[in-house]
């Protein structure tokens, strides 16, 4: 059972060894490499997005916590790293738009995969799919965290510890760098931030050969123990001995950030080798690349016979032609037509919106004119009523006065 509270999320060594990724057949070396790769993506993406270091640190902690509960085989490292950056930017009150995050990670993947830098069309179907996937993964992270995303970093303890120990100033930057590197490991889910801070201070002091008080032991003043500090130093030393982390495709539903087919070819070829061991001997490299291109959309590997059937149905090749001779070219043409149709649909929607807005404006103008005409006719009728009503009252008033005067004159005559 993983203990989760407002300010901690810690696992034992046994729980870490029995992670969901291990249960799905991913070995320890691959899991460590992919965790480091994802944290590198978060750090580089945050720098390109011009985010403060606190955002990258929070994103890396969320990344490590998420893969303690979910498997690397079910959630791709790239999309989880992007979602952690997006979520951490909001948690640290430096929000970025989803469009900006997708553009930055698209550029990073192009550079890491040695692909040409392409313009990311925000009206394409691929972009909308990436945006939906980014939001969906963010919801998964929040659900697995129980919406408890409080993170306490070791950085805030380092300055206090070093000031208390009266160490030289160059030790502070070294300890800060070690604290940043510790986030690429599982130390943040194994030890409290105070213990990690003591570990990086101890490692920095040993590197600069700065003596620390041992009688009484200095770590007891900071609520730490010697065995935990030694474990932190051991994990950091192991991290620096590893080669540069590379992406390993272990996720079944991994979606690249690039539109190019080269990154998909590498994934398709690896999947072909795993599923069809003898395919490389029976089919040449051109056929393998063509099959990977044809299966990129569906994410499945098909046989050459199925591809021949599909090409016959589409009518793009004759029965006597090779199976995959022009498959990549035809697929690119189909992709261009799909993009063009998407753009035409978007333009049509914009035109419809403009027409509807213009129609609403014309309706409003006509309503205003109609109201003005009604007001004018109403004022005219009111004026007429006033004129006619005034004269009639006046005539009635005068006639009644005349009548009274006549009656009174008659009475006077009678009295006389």
Swiss-Prot record:
Disruption phenotype: Lethal, due to male sterility. It is found in: Nucleus. One of its GO terms (molecular function) is cyclin-dependent protein serine/threonine kinase regulator activity. Residues 304-315, 328-374, 384-393, 401-410 have a biased composition (Basic and acidic residues). The keyword Disulfide bond does not apply. Keywords: Cell cycle, Cell division, Cyclin, Meiosis, Nucleus. InterPro entries: Cyclin-like_dom (IPR013763), Cyclin-like_sf (IPR036915), Cyclin/Ssn8 (IPR043198), Cyclin_N (IPR006671). Residues 286-416 are annotated as: Disordered. One of its GO terms (biological process) is regulation of DNA-templated transcription. Its main location: nucleus. SUPFAM superfamilies: Cyclin-like (SSF47954). One of its GO terms (cellular component) is nucleus. It comes from the Eukaryota. Belongs to the cyclin family. Cyclin L subfamily. Cognate cyclin for CDKG1. Required for synapsis and male meiosis, and for the proper splicing of specific resistance (R) genes. Involved in regulation of DNA methylation and transcriptional silencing. Forms a complex with CDKG1. Interacts with MOS4 and associates with the spliceosome. PANTHER family: CYCLIN. This is Cyclin-L1-1. It comes from Arabidopsis thaliana.
